[in-house]
Structures are given as structure tokens and as C-alpha cells.
Swiss-Prot record:
GO terms for MF: phosphoribosylanthranilate isomerase activity
EC number: 5.3.1.24
Reaction catalyzed: N-(5-phospho-beta-D-ribosyl)anthranilate = 1-(2-carboxyphenylamino)-1-deoxy-D-ribulose 5-phosphate
Listed SUPFAM superfamilies: Ribulose-phoshate binding barrel
Gene: trpF
Pfam families reported in the protein's UniProt record: PRAI (PF00697)
GO biological process per UniProt: L-tryptophan biosynthetic process
CDD domains in the record: PRAI
Organism whose genome encodes this protein: Methanococcus maripaludis (strain DSM 14266 / JCM 13030 / NBRC 101832 / S2 / LL)
Pathway(s) it belongs to: Amino-acid biosynthesis; L-tryptophan biosynthesis; L-tryptophan from chorismate: step 3/5
Family membership noted in the UniProt record: Belongs to the TrpF family.
InterPro entries noted in UniProt: Aldolase_TIM, PRAI_dom, RibuloseP-bd_barrel, TrpF_fam
Keywords (A to Z) from UniProt: Amino-acid biosynthesis, Aromatic amino acid biosynthesis, Isomerase, Tryptophan biosynthesis
Name the UniProt record assigns to this protein: N-(5'-phosphoribosyl)anthranilate isomerase
Length: 211
């Protein structure tokens, strides 16, 4: 299963993440305590042996152009209402791999109806990967009944409030293509290797679970 460990800030965190994850991410141009500067991001991209996603809430193409050109990354994670025309421009101009976030409600009174609405929104986009999140890296879980329905139709990456204690059952239930974690593997606002190790072990247990 694809595992992305997001929100790194230092080379030390990068080295830990590289031992366990398939990809990582740096937070740029958005309101987050994990936000880092372009120079730091560029350094991490250059040091990395795994893909580094530039994560941002920007909807302006020029902001994404600055991110790409300064950091040198070819991987973008978009948490905004950016339109398909802008995405097409970025892909044609820079050839980037784009993961687009779609918001799932924390609780749903009608999971099937909510899932159909989100599926319709997803189908209006052409991107490389779909991320289902509770909302802009808030660190809260969402209604997995909704994401389970969507995961039956698309290869999705699941995010939102994941941690070593809940990820096994969530992976078993939703059956995503991949998962994305940040705050759930931190201790004192830094990536914790023991938490990451336990998280990844439980992801694999959930992935290999058979009814």
C-alpha cells in the first residue's frame, strides 16, 4: 500500500520518513504550523530519495508556478477549489504529478448521497491521484462510510486523523489505494520514528486482513 508521511520540516525528519514511506510532503503557502519556507523545501526536495509533494491551499496558478520553479518538485498536492483549466495548464507546462484533495464530512446522515455528490465532483476533474480528507490537514477523522463507497470506484489516498491506533481498522474497512498521515505520527510537533514504525506495521496488517 502507498504510504505518504507528510509535513516534514528538517533533513532529520526526511531520513526517518524515507525508511518507511513511499512519499513525503512539505507544507507551503497555507496556514499550518508545519509550513516551511521555499528555501527549506528546495533543500528537502534535493536531498530526498522519495517523491516530495508540495502541499498547498493555493488556487492561483502563479503560486503553483513559483512553488514548482523554486523547489524543483514534480509532485503537487492541491487542497483548494482550483479549476481543471488551471490544472491542465500546470500539467502541460511542467509535467507534474497532481494529487487533488476532496473533502469528506466528519459525519454524514446519508453516506450514499454524500458519496455520490463527491464522486460527481471527482469526475469533473482529471488528476493523477485522488485524496480524501476531512479538510485541509485538520487532523480529524471523517465519516469512513462515505470514503469506503468512493474507494470502491476510484483508487484513493485516505487522510484525516490517522494514527497508529486507528489505522489498522480504517484500512480494513475503507480498503484505500494508499494513506497519508502527518500529525498522527508526531511527538512534540516532530516526526517520531517509533510512531511511524508502528503506524506502517498496522497499515500492512490492515492491508493484508482477510474476512
Amino acid at each position: 500500500m502507498f504510504i505518504k508521511i507528510c509535513g516534514i520540516k528538517t533533513p532529520e525528519e526526511l531520513r526517518i520518513v524515507e525508511n518507511y514511506g513511499n512519499a513525503t510532503g512539505v507544507i507551503l503557502e497555507c496556514a499550518s504550523k508545519r509550513r516551511i519556507g521555499f528555501e527549506t523545501a528546495k533543500n528537502l526536495v534535493n536531498l530526498a530519495n522519495i517523491p516530495v509533494f508540495a502541499v498547498s491551499t493555493a488556487s492561483d496558478v502563479s503560486v503553483w508556478e513559483n512553488i514548482i520553479e523554486f523547489t524543483g518538485t514534480n509532485y503537487l498536492q492541491m487542497h483548494s477549489d482550483i479549476d481543471q483549466k488551471a490544472i491542465d495548464f500546470i500539467k502541460n507546462e511542467y509535467g507534474c504529478f497532481i494529487m487533488k484533495s476532496f473533502k469528506i464530512p466528519e459525519t454524514s446522515t446519508s453516506p450514499e448521497i454524500d458519496a455520490e455528490k463527491i464522486i460527481s465532483e471527482i469526475e469533473s476533474y482529471e488528476v493523477d491521484r485522488i485524496l480524501l480528507d476531512t479538510g485541509k490537514g485538520c487532523g480529524q477523522t471523517h465519516d469512513h462510510r462515505v470514503s469506503q463507497i468512493i474507494a470502491k470506484k476510484f483508487d484513493i489516498v485516505l487522510a484525516g486523523g490517522l494514527d497508529p491506533d486507528n489505522v489498522l481498522n480504517i484500512v480494513k474497512y475503507v480498503k484505500p489505494f494508499g494513506i497519508d498521515v502527518s500529525s498522527g505520527v508526531e511527538n512534540n510537533n516532530s516526526k517520531d520514528e517509533e510512531l511511524i514504525k508502528r503506524f506502517c506495521e498496522n497499515v500492512k496488517l490492515g492491508e493484508n486482513y482477510e474476512m
